[in-house]
Amino acid sequence: MKNTKALLEFWEEQMKQSHRSSNYFFRKSPSHYHMMLLVMSAHKFDQKLSVEELKTKLFKTSRPKSALIINEACEKGFFFLERTSTDQRKKNIKPSESFVKEFDDYIITLKNLVL
């Protein structure tokens, strides 16, 4: 029960943070959270993830909606786009250094709250 209370307190603290923070942005919808996990998974496993691949992998999200979320995440500085060397039309999506740190801190805190 103690860990459940700690998890609740952690969640409430996350939600109190600025509306411009990544904590708020990626919890707006399941699609936002799923996108964060897909991008960070590719980053952690040192895999390339193109914008088109990301749009395809997001379930129950239209391509225009996916594009809006990606653009907003880039505008807020959580992700950035990098053109590939082989095909200048293709762009890979990567997390910013500051977002990687926020994500790592988030994961460490969650691990410490094991129920």
Label every model-predicted segment.
Residues 9-38:
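Short alpha-helical segments that sit at the start of domains
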Residues 18, 104-115:
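Amphipathic alpha-helical dimerization/coiled-coil segments
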Residues 39-43:
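Short helix-to-turn junction characteristic of helix-turn-helix DNA-binding domains
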Residues 45-57:
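Short acidic, hydrophobic short linear motifs in intrinsically disordered regions
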Residues 60-75:
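Short amphipathic alpha-helical interaction segments
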Residues 74-84:
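A short, conserved structural fragment
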Residues 84-107:
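Short, cationic-aromatic polyanion-contact patches
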